[in-house]
């Protein structure tokens, strides 16, 4: 391919991207819904603080491809319901509250509280109920009784991740507002012929997000299979990772939300990347949350769970001899 052909191709791709991210007025209903769906696909695949941390937690806790896909589907269903409401508000002009007030802080706090409560529920009854000391290498001051139990008993003590909570979590997280939300709420939704059509913009956006979240959920759920663990070990690692991530991730979300509430300027601090796609256009608080919850807390919890499962299996093998 010649340099001229390459430049022409890049120009076409940039023109298409510009059309999607800056849609003109006067579009037909079908075009509006198509653009909303494509935006949803882009939203689902890019690292977003309102989707990835929660999808990671619920998906990896399901410890299977089918379970991960289910978690992504359920979470996105709640998210889709909220987006339908949001685009309806955009059509009637009530979504201007997002212009007048920064709601990121309250949403982060609420999402964090729900994550913490679910994580605490999963950890209650085992020595994992205060995982901070072990995660950060501090003094172990609580009982380690469960570490001496057979792996079947330990696995049963860490409760299964309640998939239905993912729906509620998706609905709450949907109230967060970013670049994609701006496009569907203030540009696409007002172009619909009536208020009865306005929710369809949010629904198609949610469905696009759902497609990618199902794929991402399945990917997260299969991380542990790389190490070829037994089903019992995978269950333990998945559940303990999900529980720790929700528990500690909830604290992180609530803490950052409180900071944004107290010092709103923090939410405006960002490094421009030059990429026009929302979620990739800058590195700011949202990016820090994704890295902190999924990259640091999630991966650390996964590593801890893996080491614990191997140690428990080794103990079980030794005791059986």
Give the predicted meaning of each segment.
Residues 48, 207, 254:
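Divalent metal-coordination and catalytic microenvironments
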Residues 113-147, 215, 251-269, 297-306:
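Transmembrane helix exit motif
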Residues 65-148:
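Membrane helix-loop-helix hairpins that form the core translocation module of multi-pass transporters
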Residues 85-93, 177-188, 219-223, 258-273:
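Membrane-helix interface motif
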Residues 196, 226, 235-321:
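C-terminal regulatory/interaction regions
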Residues 19-99, 183-198:
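Juxtamembrane transmembrane-helix termini in multi-pass membrane transport proteins
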């Amino acid at each position: 391919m010649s340099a001229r052909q390459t430049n022409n191709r890049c120009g076409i791709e940039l023109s298409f991207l510009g059309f999607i991210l800056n849609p003109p007025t006067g579009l037909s209903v079908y075009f509006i819904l198509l653009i909303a769906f494509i935006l949803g696909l882009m939203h689902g695949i890019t690292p977003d603080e309102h989707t990835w941390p929660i999808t990671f937690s619920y998906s990896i806790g399901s410890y299977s491809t089918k379970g991960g896909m289910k978690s992504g589907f359920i979470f996105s269903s709640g998210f889709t319901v909220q987006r339908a409401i949001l685009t309806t508000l955009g059509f009637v002009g009530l979504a201007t509250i997002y212009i007048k007030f920064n709601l990121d802080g309250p949403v982060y706090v609420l999402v964090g509280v729900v994550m913490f409560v679910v994580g605490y529920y999963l950890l209650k009854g085992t020595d994992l109920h205060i995982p901070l000391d072990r995660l950060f290498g501090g003094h172990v001051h609580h009982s380690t009784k469960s570490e001496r139990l057979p792996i079947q008993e330990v696995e049963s003590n860490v409760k299964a991740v309640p998939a239905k909570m993912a729906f509620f979590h998706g609905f709450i997280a949907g109230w967060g507002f970013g670049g994609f939300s701006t496009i569907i709420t203030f540009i696409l939704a007002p172009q619909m012929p009536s208020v009865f059509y306005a929710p369809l913009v949010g629904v198609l956006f949610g469905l696009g997000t759902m497609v990618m979240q199902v794929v991402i959920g399945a990917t997260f759920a299969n991380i542990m299979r790389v190490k070829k663990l037994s089903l019992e070990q995978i269950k333990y690692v998945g559940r303990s990772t999900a529980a720790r991530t929700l528990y500690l991730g909830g604290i992180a979300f609530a803490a950052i939300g409180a900071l944004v509430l107290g010092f709103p300027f923090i939410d405006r601090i960002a490094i421009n990347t030059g990429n026009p796609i929302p979620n990739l256009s800058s590195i700011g608080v949202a990016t820090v949350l994704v890295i902190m919850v999924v990259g640091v807390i999630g991966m650390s919890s996964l590593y801890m769970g893996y080491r614990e499962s191997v140690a428990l299996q080794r103990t079980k093998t030794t005791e059986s001899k």
